[in-house]
Design a protein with these regions (language model features):
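C-terminal output/interaction extensions
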Residues: 106-114
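Conserved binding/recognition cores within well-folded domains
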Residues: 1-96
Length: 114
């Protein structure tokens, strides 16, 4: 059985299996995050730092100050001219997720990319 986490959103709690259901998490404001899931987008009042510590053991990776991705949902990795990467993920192909220079070395090591 896969581990479930609870997301507080708009007065209710949603139980979700991160590895199977969460595609990516983005945050533009420090106190809230958008969980892009296989069931739709869920907004929750959590910081990316808290989410990262919760989900990194479950196959998630911080790619940028504003993004955490489920590594198993990556479909395509594009090299950018400025030395960064751009990810395309399943379920949300229009959301192009950056891998910033700060995280790129660890990202490549994690995925065993040369």
């Amino acid at each position: 059985t896969s581990q479930k986490i609870s997301l507080q959103t708009q007065g209710k709690t949603i139980m979700i299996s991160p590895a199977q259901e969460i595609v990516l998490i983005s945050s533009e404001k420090s106190d809230r995050a958008l969980f892009y899931t296989t069931r739709g987008i869920i907004e929750s009042k959590m910081t990316l730092r808290d989410i990262e510590s919760l989900l990194s053991p479950l196959g998630f990776f911080r790619t940028h100050k504003g993004y955490i991705v489920n590594l198993s949902m990556i479909q395509e990795i594009q090299n950018q001219d400025n030395g960064t990467l751009l990810l395309t993920l399943s379920h949300y192909p229009k959301e192009k997720v950056p891998v910033s220079r700060h995280y790129i070395k660890d990202f490549k090591n994690t995925l065993h990319l040369v």
